[in-house]
């Protein structure tokens, strides 16, 4: 049993990978649960790993070998979020296809507060940037499913163009 003292993406990913081929059962507690970690789990399971999740606890039963597999890696949520911020900033229109909007739900709600019009339908996101970008006070980055730290700089650019004062705090 390994209990992480704080949420950490890199340590969670590396521990999962290492535990796949370790003898016996490994239990990881207080894991980061970013979508990329869940996607890594799906990939490893498709190669023969035995990984399961309950909340922030990951259970891995070690296997002797992993098998070759074909797998489509998920779309990059930070890249998609960056395009969404850019459309809001440019007051333009954007359509993103083949992307699960649920994984950036928090950021899309935030962009709505800035004034963007957003529709998410199945695997598509439609964004129309506002004519006037509203300010937002007290945005706080947080581990997933909170506002992604990796989108903080893009959001700061958007805040510079907003009417009024805005603030963001790194968690």
What is each residue range found by the language model?
Residues 1-171:
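Short, structured segments at the rim of ligand-binding sites
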